[in-house]
UniProtKB/Swiss-Prot annotation:
Extracellular topology ranges: 27-110
Domain of life: Bacteria
Textual note on the cofactor: Binds 1 zinc ion per subunit.
Lineage, top ranks: Bacteria, Bacillati, Actinomycetota, Actinomycetes, Mycobacteriales
Keywords: ATP-binding, Cell membrane, Hydrolase, Membrane, Metal-binding, Metalloprotease, Nucleotide-binding, Protease, Transmembrane, Transmembrane helix, Zinc
Listed name of the protein: ATP-dependent zinc metalloprotease FtsH
Compositionally skewed regions (Low complexity) per UniProt: 650-671, 700-709, 721-732
Organism: Mycobacterium leprae (strain TN)
Disulfide bridge positions per record: none
Amino acid sequence: MNRKNVIRMVTAIAVVVLLGWSFFYFSDDTRGYKFVDTSVAMSQINGHNVKSAQIDDREQQLRLTLKKGNNDTDGSDKVITKYPTGYAVDLFNALSAKNTKVTTAVNEGSILGELLVYVLPLLLLVGLFVMFSRMQGGARMGFGFGKSRAKQLSKDMPKTTFADVAGVDEAVEELYEIKDFLQNPCRYQTLGAKIPKGVLLYGPPGTGKTLLARAVAGEAGVPFFTISGSDFVEMFVGVGASRVRDLFDQAKQNSPCIIFVDEIDAVGRQRGTGLGGGHDEREQTLNQLLVEMDGFGDRAGVILIAATNRPDILDPALLRPGRFDRQIPVSNPDLAGRRAVLRVHSKGKPIADDADLDGLAKRTVGMTGADLANVVNEAALLTARENGLVITGPALEEAVDRVIGGPRRKGRIISEQEKKITAYHEGGHTLAAWAMPDIEPIYKVTILARGRTGGHAVAVPEEDKGLRTRSEMIAQLVFAMGGRAAEELVFREPTTGAVSDIEKATKIARSMVTEFGMSSKLGAVRYGSEHGDPFLGRTMGTQADYSHEVARDIDDEVRKLIEAAHTEAWEILTEYRDVLDTLAGELLEKETLHRPELEGIFASVEKRPRLTMFDDFGGRIPSDKPPIKTPGELAIERGEPWPQPVPEPAFKAAIARASQAAEASHQAAQSDTDGPPGQGANGSHAGDRQRQHGPTQPDYGAPPGWHAPGWPPQQPPDYWYPPEQQPSQSPYWPQPAPSYPGQAPPPYPSYPPCPSYPPPGQSAPDAGKPPAQLDEGVSPSNPPAHG
């Protein structure tokens, strides 16, 4: 309901209430009378203080005009009171005995009042009936509830472009094609391509899905409607389906246009007969959305872009081609993506020379675009808090810590003993990780309390990794158990500070056994399956699909992994106890240590050999032959420069070569049209020249140069002939693709018909350019994606 409708409704209600109050106020003839108890009225009658009286028999009330007011009547000389049923005769006799003027009034009641008593409920019922009828009428639902809440972006709003999006180049390229189709449909229609009807953006929160949609809105140049999935469903039945219909009606009236539905999982969750039943309001909304996206109705020129964090719970009918033709993953940015994101968000901000954005990108593995934007913004806020003029490297470092662990707890006062335990605990983590061979180096260790932690050690990977080996996961276990081992080794008793470390180690060990099949005893088997209900939006837990004996074996294997890591951490700390004491002392003095300082402390620490107790392949003997070397490794061995990456996928190069061959053939055919006339146009020898021009007239087998009245037979002007192709010649690109002879493919709805491409006498943009000279990632069928 918009603001204008609310104002109208409130005004109408106020007018009706005011009119009703005015009617009853001005029709009341008891104004001016003071209401008193019946006993007070009787005392005035008995005291000969009544000048005149009026008995209202219908209302059972008595009006008295007194000779003089007194304390009982609060000084009023006009009073009114009620009397019991059947007491009117006694009142009349009492007043007559006092020689008081008595008037008896029997009110018949007003006709308007009678009508209001009977007609008002009837009008109320009729109004409710009309309102519910309009609610069932689709978009004209009562009070505007069925109207779509989609907002159409205006031209005055600040625009986001693809240049403002970084770190998700693949998604930008896919969406750029949508924008290019809307602005330049001819190139696609000539090939018979159809624009995708729907695009689904899915990925973790903060990766830039909504930002991509805003960029499309800023660059498309067509009407853009935006709505949230939660705006469809309300408390009234039928509201969601009505709003879906109204949204697509608006879109069709403004086609070509784009609709963006954010958080579509609020309305597009998988249907079922469990919770909610088949008549659930959300299911009705989803069914209407499915019909509008791809049903019997016409949906010309309407593109639906949706975003979600949970593609796994969406209904399969919503994800099929024809509804969401293109599903684009938007994942966390890699190293190059993080660099680009930091450059975008630091643009326009005064960054100091000592601020290393490239190093910051390396230290923020796993952060999303939103996290990186928050880091830069937090650094700017910290600089402004200290009245600084430029954002420095330490400010960015502090901002990273604030985003990861929360603000520093400055007001927390801890004892010297607890601070010492924290220093040894974090030192145990750091030393255990430094001595393990398959773990990322420790970048920073601190005992400053942040959020719910009393300190932390940060291990930063030097490069992005998509795979983890068993040795790396065991090293992570040793790293996690280093704090508990230090507590037991130095203070001879554990503390509660290792609760998060134990939880992390248990999770890693259990996933190694039950998910990744890294236990030789249990084999490469996945134990436990997730089960739940899609209505809840998440799984309801893990179902144990194995026996009690297997469960006991799983617990034994998990315990064995953690105990081995605990023992390894203990041995490392025992061997380098002096180094641990030195590290703890430095932490107590400086509170935070970085990698250069740690390298000086750990100069005597050597890498431990890998744990081999779990290298059991069940009787299978691994090969002694090493794997082959990559081209980069071979180039390093030979002292050669690093090999260049593959410039573009094979299909792009193939398309470019075929397009150039087709263009060359077309130019050769055009040059032959200006040559000297040869033999007849209808003989068998003339067919070769005609084929070079494309299909014109069929060859009827007449002798060369032979003519006769009515020969050759004439065909209708728009008669269609199948194209003929030379054995060694590719067809001219692009070729028409009619659905049947005599009819060319219709242009895309709401667009003007396309001119031929390339125009006669002109060459394609890349004609005559060998494949090696084509720009990397650019081909006639793949325009560059800006930003």
